UniProtKB/Swiss-Prot annotation:
GTP binds at residues 86-93, 111-115, 193-195, 234-236. Belongs to the TRAFAC class dynamin-like GTPase superfamily. IRG family. This is Immunity-related GTPase family M protein. There is a cross-link at residue 272 (Glycyl lysine isopeptide (Lys-Gly) (interchain with G-Cter in ubiquitin)). The keyword Magnesium does not apply.
């Protein structure tokens, strides 16, 4: 078997990619707040245009396939992970355990009681496609400062960091965490030798784990480091303790790092398309062309008009069923995100529409039929409100499609 790693002297990992300033900004799509990058993929513009066309035409089931294709393309983007910490903390052993390979295998990272990692070395894993795991030389073996270490190891080229610790959470670990946080990067703290701690401690397993976690948090909080994921593992047991949770968290964060910014951009485009569509229909309503444009016999029949609006925007029952099928889930996952399933449900959910259609207003509406201008004004208000609510539901469905494409719902 050919080794899947190679040593290098701090060569650049990837072409330097510009970071966005959205790390601390609220995310419209409610993705976890992780650093994200504007990474170019030649096929993405055409895929994006196809989804935009589908949205303009109210064909959301077609949009689903374009979004899934977008996420599949983004998933091929390489991501670099730096594994760092003090010398002797078991960083190389951790990399082998994370990849679920034995130390004796050709592709494994060299391990030993003496310092084995002298230069940066990169590794790959079938469990994390298109991910480069970088095993960095341990910090603290020389008089080198943390700042010089970070510069020499090219921290600015990394997407996600793993700070490895064992026995004690040192000042070097805290400095690393503080600097990485100031860079706006995502990172975890991994305690790697839990098996040894459990075998030597007089405390119960629950109490020992609690003590380790509290100690790490206290040291970080003293230096103003915000809440960070902490995982306690044993390098000897790659399937036990927090390893499964770590791998799941890592998979989620990898998806967010790759997809978050492009999908946020796509959602902004979708919002504009919906806004333009609402403006166009508001003009139709204002011009008194609603009946012919909607294709209804009676534009005072709010229930029938609602069905037409839902069809125009692509969130009618049949479309929702097709969307759910395309996303591999049940239709109720999507119906639960809308209020416009029928007119009575929508009316109950929105007090303004309820007021516009209450008995008193309906009686006035009948009287105003003898005053065409006032009658038209009331009708326009009702339809504009209902149109706005359908547009809002459409945005909710689009948001869910984008989120589910990255993290499919569990059914």
């Amino acid at each position: 078997m050919k080794p899947s790693h190679k040593s290098c002297e701090a060569a650049p990992l990837l072409p330097k990619m510009p970071e966005t300033s959205t790390h601390n900004a609220p995310l419209n799509l409610s993705f976890p707040s992780v650093p994200s990058y504007q990474i170019g993929c030649s096929s993405l513009p055409e895929i994006s245009r196809s989804t935009e066309r589908a949205l303009k035409e109210g064909k959301l089931p077609e949009l689903v396939y374009g979004v899934k294709e977008t996420v599949a393309t983004l998933s091929q983007i390489p991501v670099s992970i730096f594994v760092t910490g003090d010398s002797g903390n078991g960083m190389s052993s951790f990399i082998n355990a994370l990849r679920i390979i034995g130390h004796e295998e050709d592709a494994s990272a060299p391990t030993g009681v003496v310092r084995t990692t002298q230069t940066r070395a990169e590794y790959s894993s079938s469990h994390f496609p298109n991910v480069v795991l970088w095993d960095l030389p341990g910090l603290g073996a020389t008089a080198q400062t943390v700042e010089n270490y970070i510069e020499e190891m090219k921290f600015s080229t990394c997407d996600l960091f793993i700070i490895v610790a064992s026995e004690q959470f040192s000042s070097n670990h805290v400095k690393l965490a503080k600097i990485i946080q100031s860079m706006g990067k995502r990172f975890y703290v991994i305690w790697t030798k839990l098996d040894r701690d459990l075998s030597t401690s007089v405390l119960s397993e629950v109490r020992l784990i609690q003590n380790i976690q509290e100690n790490i948090r206290e040291n970080l909080q003293k230096e103003g480091v915000k809440e960070v994921p902490i995982f306690l593992v044993s390098n000897l047991d790659p399937l036990l303790h927090d390893f499964p949770e770590l791998r799941n968290t890592l998979q989620t964060d990898l998806s967010n790092i790759r997809c978050c910014e492009p999908l946020k951009t796509l959602y902004v485009i979708y919002e504009k398309i919906i806004g333009d569509k609402v403006a166009n229909w508001n003009q139709i309503i204002a011009n008194g062309r609603l009946k012919s444009s909607l294709g209804v016999r009676d534009d005072d029949d709010m229930g029938e008009c609602l069905k037409r609006y839902r069809l125009i925007f692509g969130i009618d029952d049949e479309s929702l069923q097709q969307i759910a099928h395309g996303m591999g889930t049940v239709v109720m996952e999507y119906k639960a995100n809308i209020k416009s399933q029928d007119f009575h449900t929508l009316r109950r959910a929105d007090w303004k529409l309820r007021l516009m259609t209450c008995t008193t207003v309906n009686a006035l509406f009948c009287l105003f039929k003898f005053l065409p201008c006032l009658c038209h004004c009331f009708k326009r208000m009702r339809h504009k409100r209902m149109l706005l609510l359908v547009a809002k539901d459409t945005k909710n469905i689009l948001k869910k499609i984008l989120m589910d494409a990255v993290s499919p719902p569990q059914i």
